[in-house]
Design a protein with these regions (language model features):
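Short, solvent-exposed polar/charged micro-motifs at secondary-structure junctions
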Residues: 1-5, 151-154, 250-255, 303
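Function-dense linear segments that define catalytic or interfacial modules
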Residues: 1-80, 92-100, 198, 203-225, ...
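Alpha-helix capping and helix-loop boundary segments enriched in small/acidic/polar residues
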Residues: 5, 14-19, 42-53, 76-88, ...
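Catalytic alpha/beta core of large soluble enzyme barrels
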Residues: 16, 62-67, 162, 172-179, ...
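Short, flexible loop/turn elements at secondary-structure junctions
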Residues: 29-34, 90, 187-188, 299-301
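Structural signal for hydrophobic packing residues in well-ordered secondary-structure cores
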Residues: 31-34, 51-73, 94-101, 117-139, ...
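Internal maturation/activation junctions in enzymes
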Residues: 54-77, 81, 103-188, 259-263, ...
Length: 303
């Protein structure tokens, strides 16, 4: 996305951001499950206004991190301050889909994922433009394609799929500048999602139920969003957890669970490779750099 900065030489450890020589990138992730709400009839929806404000705050926070960071090398500091890449991503996506009763591998689920990522991408760009007004433009702006009115994600070229006025974003960037070279990247969040108690990155839930063995015996751990759905359906009990565990963490062969519930509570191993790729594409359309993708195989998989 830049001219005359040399070749892309590396990625970060999980591959979601492509980097020029000496270039770092600060990452952060929003637990989107936290924005699920319920109306008086018990129907789930997303609090888009709250998500907008958090997206803007997170973008500002990540820009702050660049300026307060301690860098091991002067060359890294100089490159970080010049390109000012930040990567705001997501976690809790699969949990949010459970709450909304949208199957991860359905057309409706993929459309929602596109809508979600376009929303975060848009408001992160809005905030980065506001930061440029108050703090100064991206130092390497003149070396970027922003000055030509281009945006660093594929969705910008797909006008028929826009839900926001991306022409305004492009024009505002040309008029006011933009603070950050990138604003959106999706990391795997393998550790921080465990701390937050939600699903990782944009991935489907790996298993609905885990059996934990300890000194005094064993007990089941169930995905919290799946538990919520099962409780709403009056299906949450020890038997259903045992049956899911016997089916390798999947509810698909637990016949007494209604089909609509089974369709909503799909796991990574229930989804075909093609469906994984389609979900990935739904997010990638609105992401500035790339996405870390986890591929799961059964223990008896062969090459």
């Amino acid at each position: 996305f830049y001219e005359h900065l040399g070749p892309i030489v590396t990625t970060n450890p999980c591959g979601e951001v492509l980097l020029y020589p000496n270039e770092p990138c600060n990452l952060g992730s929003i637990n989107v499950w936290k924005f699920a709400r319920h109306d008086d009839d018990g129907n789930s929806y997303v609090d888009w206004e709250a998500l907008k404000e958090v997206t803007k705050s997170c973008t500002r926070f990540l820009d702050n991190v660049i300026d307060v960071n301690n860098f091991p090398l002067k060359a890294i500091e100089e490159m970080s301050l010049a390109t000012r890449k930040v990567g705001l991503g997501v976690m809790g996506v699969a949990n949010l889909l459970y709450e909304l009763k949208l199957p991860y591998n359905s057309e409706e689920g993929r459309k929602f994922m596109e809508q979600l990522m376009e929303f975060i991408s848009y408001w992160s760009k809005v905030e980065s433009i506001e930061l440029a007004k108050s703090r100064g433009n991206l130092p390497y702006y003149d070396k970027s394609f922003y000055k030509k009115g281009k945006l660093p994600f594929r969705g910008a070229d797909l006008r028929d799929e826009w839900h926001f006025d991306w022409d305004k974003i492009s024009n505002d960037i040309k008029r006011y500048g933009i603070r950050n070279g990138y604003t959106t990247i999706i990391a795997p969040t393998g550790s921080i999602s465990m701390i937050a108690g939600c699903s990782s990155g944009m991935e489907p839930v790996y298993s609905l139920v885990f059996e934990k063995n300890v000194a005094v015996g064993s007990f089941y751990y169930i995905d919290p969003a799946a538990e919520k759905v099962l409780r709403e359906e009056g299906l949450f009990n020890d038997k259903v957890m045992e049956d899911i565990n016997k089916n390798k963490g999947s509810i698909q062969n637990v016949d007494y669970v209604p089909e609509k519930v089974r369709k909503a509570l799909v796991t990574a191993m229930d989804i075909t490779p093609e469906e994984h790729i389609r979900a990935l594409a739904s997010f990638q359309k609105w992401v500035d750099s790339s996405i870390s993708k986890t591929n799961n195989f059964p223990a008896d998989a062969t090459l």
